[in-house]
Amino acid sequence: MKYFLLFFLALLCTGCQLFQGQQQAGENVATEAKQEEVFVPVEKELYVIKEGTVRDKDFKIKGEAYSFPFGEKIKIVAEGKEFYRTERGDYIEKNNAGNWETLKALITDEMLIRNIDINGNPNDSIAKYLAITQISYEEYQEALKHKVDFLIEDTLSIVKKKGKLTFPCQHKTIYLKDQPDDFENPFSTTYAYVGNMPALNQYLVFEDSEDFYAYIFIDKTTGKQTEFQRFPFLSTDKKYIITVGRAYEDLEGIISLYRIESIKPFKINLLVDESTKWWAAYDFDKQPIFFSKNGYLYASMNVVANFFDEKDELNPQRMYIKIKIK
């Protein structure tokens, strides 16, 4: 029994020493990396091509709250063997950063339709109805030559008077009046007539509030109003409506697809209403979103982290996509 106790104590001591050695080895990784890294001053701009944790001056992970979002542009001021030092003084692993072309090459069809629900589970509703492909700027420009547009911009036919728009419909007249902010409603709202879509028998109105904006269809027969988060693009075969753009406040894109069931009465069925977590289309820009004769919807887009440039303006450096309705 005596020898057994001595043997057990020896094993216990050895195990403790082994655990302490492993713990010390883990703690020394960052220190060893710091000692090995020799930084050379450089000036370059790279993009985060793999979401990675931010590291401090000792190369230790700052925590989950600190991370480089996919696609973010970072200014590099020094380069070592394993890490880059950024302009703001933290560090990123070199294999987590690349140039613009490297970032673009990572944007696959699968990534563009990837969607995660609120619980973090895969959601295939976008992939079920839509195919999204990255294209070149040249292909986008060529498709623009064959743009199909069903909107008639007869903005002078309905003029606002004393802050009120009047829409004569067959069954009744619809009034939309601007709402100034006040004690009960701190957000003002204004309306602007955009035009009409004869193919759908609808007026189109833009609603602009301080905390959101939307587009409204007004049925020319019934006066019924149908609201969309973004501009409703009518497909070339007149069977579907797509809306795509960036959420007003959230750092994510949005995309919706409606199937037109009937025009008189106007009835649509919502098929897709999802957020694209890491990319968004530019829906307010000189480069338009449009349907082309081939039935595809074309748009310029960007990763959310690179949507705006350093001046907080729409980033001219962007990518292009085409969307097919299945």
Residue ranges and their predicted role:
Residues 14-15:
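C-terminal motif of bacterial Sec signal peptides marking the signal peptidase cleavage site
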Residues 123-125, 138, 163-185, 209-227, ...:
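Surface-exposed loop/turn elements that mediate protein-protein interactions on large endomembrane-trafficking
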Residues 24-43, 60-103:
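SH3/SH3-like beta-barrel superfamily modules
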Residues 184-196, 226-234, 275-291:
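Conserved beta-propeller blade repeats
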Residues 239-308:
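Short aromatic loop motif centered on NTY/YTY
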Residues 157-159, 194-200, 231-243, 288-297:
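Blade-terminus and WD-like Trp-Asp/Gly-His loop motifs, strongest in beta-propeller folds
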Residues 2-7:
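Sec-dependent signal peptide recognition
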Residues 107-207:
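Terminal domain-start segments
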